[in-house]
Every structure is written in structure tokens, then in C-alpha cells.
Swiss-Prot record:
Residues engaged in binding ATP: 40-47
Keyword ATP-binding belongs to the record: yes
Disulfide bonds: none
UniProt similarity note: Belongs to the ABC transporter superfamily. Carbohydrate importer 2 (CUT2) (TC 3.A.1.2) family.
Name this polypeptide is given: Putative ribose/galactose/methyl galactoside import ATP-binding protein 3
Protein's organism: Agrobacterium fabrum (strain C58 / ATCC 33970)
GO cellular component: plasma membrane
E.C. no: 7.5.2.11, 7.5.2.7
Function: Part of an ABC transporter complex involved in carbohydrate import. Could be involved in ribose, galactose and/or methyl galactoside import. Responsible for energy coupling to the transport system.
Length: 499
């Protein structure tokens, strides 16, 4: 290592899969003590480049240098030995283990051939304290909200004394306050000389936190610039190869009578006395800080969690929903926040994932009619522009945006009256986000009632007809589209303005 050596220098990196050139002659350099953002649409090559850096893929051509020394990484363990750590968007943790056990999994301290649990707890507590994360190291990981699990994942990487740390969409599950806290952690790491690679679709955050920005498009490196010398609009133009006039277009729709109404919903713990209604042809936004109870309300409406009190009405008639099957029968569909854990079945094809809720309808005498099954999948693959347009492809091989379109297709196949979408554009690029907004717009134009949970305020304000803000398990009165401002939403979410 020389005094002026870069933390990372990848030269001429190409990666060819059968029939696909995922990366083409990419040059990528990252310096110690700097935060380097990588942006691009899904399919631009970000994941492939990071998988090469982390040792999961070998490049077809090209070289990688760490601290001025050329290295070859044939497996993730090789990258880890070189001080490279990855924090994935889809968390790589064990829910049934404690926070401390997750942080030190695979490298727990031992004493006389046994795990030294007290030493492990002390070390975990010290790491969490250094990162200013108020998390009990003895807590079961699965009992924590996703936002705190994300911080545990970061603590796990930080505890390994990394030289280079890669964060993939690290704020996708965090509130604005938690994002600010994370940025404080990243700046502390930066001050310690750690090289940080920051992958995100949230361009405002990229400009807030990054020192440098690299834009990828179609497997090629388009540009690298200081973050201070580029705007979000320029990044979008370079990412997609065109000007994007309106990231959140509002599709006109005819708003009809109340199609869905909830009154006095409470689970006795995480949300209390929640009420709102949605009209046919309307998008009702449900926003607030992470932990405000939005997802818990949606899960209870869909029958995934019990209600202590409350009334649910569809088209003016009270319905009882005690399970997801009962919800689907009543005409309610729910697209969950956690695509990987609760949405897709990774081992199944796109066709099989789309058909799951309607297998009985597609079957005759207990046997599935394959022509009807294939026809249904082909229709949604075509209508929703799922890429690649192959219903037999395993769904886990698709980008996040295309997986999300397949999940939405699944529930539309069930013919719902009400569609609840929980963070539908979380972790997808601008192009996929626009496609998902187009789909939602077409649904409400056709008369469907949509409840959209989102933490992204520009999205809420751009797409929704009315917005309900949740704080500490309670819901505000709905705010009409014309009265929406980011300041008002945040004031309600933080308690600065009474609900």
C-alpha cells in the first residue's frame, strides 16, 4: 500500500452472462475517508459491480486493486479478509438470535471452547454505543422494527473493522429522523478513514451525504463527479438517458362513492382508534414516521394480525376479516412492504407467483388449467411491462421493480375492490417507480379504491388525492390534495401540529 493509494480501483470490469452483457468496461475508483454514491436504474449494473467487489461473482475481464495491490476475490470470504463489508437492502440477519449474536455471528468470542456470552454482550453494547444506536444487545432481533434491524446490520459490518463498506439502499426502511441519525454514523465512519460506497435511488439523500457520485446506465459507467457539482435532475437524465419532466405524475380519475371505510380500529398496543375512508377512483395516502403504526394497521385490515376493536365496511356493508383468505374473499388485497420476506416466493416462476391467490379459480376438478394459468400470467406480464417478458423465469432473478409489478399483478388477479400498497416503490429506480405509478393510476381510473402507505413525501404529495398522517398509533384527519405541504405532513408526523 502506498501513501496515495486509492481504497478501491476497478479497471475495465466486464461481466457477461449467457446472452447478456451485464457490465461493459467499467472503471470505478473510491478513496479512503470519502462517501461515494453509485446510482442508476435497476438493471444498470450496480448489483453486478458490487457482487464482483464482494467476491460473489468473478469478472469476465478486468482487474481490482485494494489499497494499490491487485487482488483476486473468488468468494465472499476473500473480500471479507480484505476488509470489504456489504450491508444489503434485504437484511442478512437471523430473527431468532439476539442482537449481539447477529452482530458477531460466525466470529463469536470464545473462552475455554465455549462462547463467551458476557464478552460478546459487552462488545456488542460498545459497538452500538459508538454508533449511537439505542438498541438492547440482548433483544431478540425479530422483535425489533425493520429500521432498528437495519442499524444492527450496519453494526455487524462496522464491528468487523472494515476498510471499505458498501451500503445498498440503507435508508429504504428508515424515517427522516432515523436517516439523519444514520448519516451521522456514516460521517463518523468517514472521519475514521473508511471508504463508503452508498447505493441509493433517493437522489436528494445522495446529494446530502455523498462526496462523489458515479452514474451507471445499461452496464456502462456514464460519469463520475463530485456530488457538489451535480443536481438531481442531471443525475436522472444521465441515469435514464432522457429528461424526466415529472417523477410523480397524477393520473386523472373520476372519484365515486365511499368504497372502503374503517372506524375505531385498535389492536390494543400499536394503534388506537384509527378511522378513514377511501372512495372508488381515489388514492388515499397513509404516511408518518417509521413505527407510527401504518403497516400494523394494514396487516390488521388484511387479517394478518388480530383487531381488538373496530369496524370494516366495503361498499357500505360491514365485513368480518379474521384471516388473509377472508380479506381476499371480501375484496381486499395487500401488497406488503417486505418483498423478499412476505411478497415473492423466490423459488417459483413469475407465472406461479401471479397465480397463487387464484389457483382455485384456475382449477377444474382439482387440477389447474395450465392454458388459463399461462394466459393470466402472459396478460399481466404484457400489461405491466414486466422485464424480461418471460412468465416462466424465476421471480428472484428479476429486478426489484419488476418483482413488485408481479406482486401487484398477483393481487389484481384476485379481483379486489380495495388495494392496500405498503411502500410500493421502496428500493426501485426512477423508471420502475414511474411504471408502478402508471399502474396505480390506471387502477383508480378504472374505479378501484387504493390505500398507499409511503414514507416518501414527494411521492405522497404527487400521487395521492388525500393523505392521513399517523403518529404513535393514531391517525390524523385526512388532508385534501390542495392543502398538502411537506411541512404540514412532518408537523403532524412529529407532533408539532395536533392531529
Amino acid at each position: 500500500m502506498t501513501a496515495t493509494a486509492s481504497a478501491l480501483r476497478m479497471r475495465g470490469i466486464s461481466k457477461i452472462f449467457p446472452g447478456v452483457k451485464a457490465l461493459s468496461n467499467v472503471n470505478f475508483t473510491v478513496e479512503y475517508g470519502r462517501i461515494h454514491a453509485v446510482v442508476g436504474e435497476n438493471g444498470a449494473g450496480k448489483s453486478t459491480l458490487m457482487k464482483i467487489l464482494s467476491g460473489s461473482y468473478a469478472p469476465t475481464t478486468g482487474t481490482t486493486e485494494i489499497a494499490g495491490v491487485e487482488v483476486q476475490m473468488r468468494r465472499p470470504a476473500d473480500a471479507q479478509k480484505l476488509g470489504i463489508r456489504m450491508v444489503h437492502q434485504e437484511l442478512n440477519l437471523v430473527p431468532d438470535l439476539t442482537v449481539a449474536e447477529n452482530i458477531y455471528l460466525g466470529r463469536m468470542p470464545h473462552r475455554r471452547f465455549l462462547v463467551d456470552r458476557q464478552a460478546m454482550l459487552r462488545k456488542a453494547a460498545a459497538v452500538l454505543k459508538e454508533l449511537e444506536a439505542a438498541i438492547d444487545p440482548k433483544a431478540r432481533l425479530g422483535d425489533l422494527p425493520i429500521s432498528q434491524q437495519q442499524l444492527v446490520e450496519i453494526a455487524k459490518s462496522y464491528s468487523a473493522d472494515p476498510r471499505i463498506i458498501v451500503l445498498d439502499e440503507p435508508t429504504s426502511s428508515l424515517s427522516e429522523h432515523e436517516t439523519t441519525a444514520l448519516f451521522s454514523i456514516l460521517r463518523k465512519m468517514k472521519s475514521q478513514g473508511i471508504a463508503i460506497i452508498y447505493i441509493s435511488h433517493r437522489l436528494k439523500e445522495v446529494l446530502d451525504i455523498a462526496d462523489d457520485v458515479t452514474i451507471l446506465r445499461d452496464g456502462s459507467m456514464i460519469d463520475t463527479r463530485p456530488a457538489a457539482g451535480i443536481t438531481a435532475a442531471e443525475m436522472i437524465r444521465l441515469m435514464v438517458g432522457r429528461e424526466v419532466a415529472n417523477v410523480f405524475p397524477k393520473t386523472p380519475s373520476k372519484i365515486g362513492p365511499v368504497a372502503f371505510k374503517v372506524t375505531g380500529l385498535s389492536d390494543g398496543e400499536k394503534f388506537h382508534d384509527v378511522g378513514f375512508d377511501v372512495r372508488s377512483g381515489e388514492i388515499l395516502g397513509l404516511t408518518g414516521l417509521v413505527g407510527a403504526g401504518r403497516t400494523e394497521v394494514a396487516q390488521a385490515i388484511f387479517g394478518l394480525a388480530p383487531l381488538a376493536t373496530g369496524r370494516i365496511e366495503i361498499n357500505g356493508k360491514a365485513v368480518t376479516i379474521g384471516s388473509p383468505a377472508a380479506a381476499v374473499k371480501a375484496g381486499v388485497a395487500y401488497v406488503p412492504e417486505d418483498r423478499k420476506g412476505d411478497g415473492i416466493v423466490p423459488s417459483m416462476s413469475v407465472r406461479e407467483n401471479i397465480s397463487l391467490p387464484v389457483l382455485r379459480r384456475l382449477s377444474r376438478l382439482g387440477r389447474i388449467g395450465m392454458s388459463r394459468d399461462r394466459g393470466l400470467a402472459a396478460k399481466y406480464t404484457r400489461d405491466f411491462s414486466i422485464v424480461p417478458p418471460d412468465p416462466e423465469r424465476r421471480i428472484n432473478l428479476l429486478s426489484g421493480g419488476n418483482q413488485q409489478k408481479a406482486i401487484i399483478s398477483r393481487w389484481l388477479a384476485a379481483g379486489p375492490k380495495v388495494l392496500i400498497l405498503d411502500e410500493p416503490t421502496r428500493g426501485v429506480d426512477v423508471g420502475a417507480k414511474a411504471e408502478i405509478h402508471r399502474i396505480i393510476g390506471e387502477l383508480v381510473a378504472g374505479g378501484m379504491a387504493v390505500v398507499m402507505i409511503s414514507s416518501e413525501l414527494p411521492e405522497v404529495m404527487g400521487v395521492c388525492d388525500r393523505v392521513v398522517v399517523m403518529r404513535d398509533g393514531r391517525a390524523s384527519s385526512p388532508i385534501a390534495r390542495g392543502d398538502l405541504t411537506e411541512e404540514r405532513i412532518m408537523a403532524l408526523a412529529t407532533g408539532e401540529e395536533p392531529a
